[in-house]
Amino acid sequence: MMGDNEGRRTPLLNLGVQVSMRVLIIGAAMASMWVMITNREVASVYGIAFEAKYSYSSAFRYLVYAQIAVCAATLFTLVWACLAVRRRGLVFALFFFDLLTTLTAISAFSAAFAEGYVGKYGNKQAGWLPICGYVHVYCSRVTISLAMSFASFVLLFILTVLTASSARHY
């Protein structure tokens, strides 16, 4: 009797962890996306006004689109995880989708981080000056967005490892 209950509790506990992690991932990705989309600042340098917006940077646009994809894929796999409890053959496909989502998240974070680094510190060899001295709020919000993006990546990475472990047992 005890063995039957123990065998049933493990998949339900696994499902609870899967659902919780996926909800946290969606929240972090949406927060990152929202902060980046609403980020805008106008500054004046030597009497010339310029605007800093996420849409002016291809790396920041990629981050936003990738976060949309992460949210959509994680929402899809949230439903998939619930189905995988009943049909164990779906667990490997779940792992595969989690892996692709994780790779998308880290590639977008890396591209946006590189752009943010150049914006903050410049690149003397290329002649690019840092802009964060002029648009403090914009750079601070980019940092917050990148932190949330990295959090979603870390959660996705942990989830992918957990899903791989679950797939091994089936």
From Swiss-Prot:
What UniProt keywords apply to this chain's record, in alphabetical order?
Answer: Cell membrane, Membrane, Transmembrane, Transmembrane helix
* Subunit structure as annotated in this protein's UniProt entry: Homodimer and heterodimers.
Member of which family? Belongs to the Casparian strip membrane proteins (CASP) family.
Coiled-coil stretches: none
Listed GO CC annotations: plasma membrane
Q: What is this protein called?
A: CASP-like protein 1F1
Q: Where are the transmembrane segments?
A: 17-37, 63-83, 89-109, 142-162
Matching entries from InterPro entries are given as: CASP/CASPL (IPR006459), CASP_dom (IPR006702), CASPL (IPR044173)
One Pfam match, by short name?
A: CASP_dom
Extracellular side residue ranges read 38-62, 110-141
Source species: Arabidopsis lyrata subsp. lyrata (Lyre-leaved rock-cress)
Residues on Cytoplasmic side: 1-16, 84-88, 163-170
Membrane topology classification: Multi-pass membrane protein
Task: List the subcellular locations.
Answer: Cell membrane
Major site of localization recorded for this protein: membrane
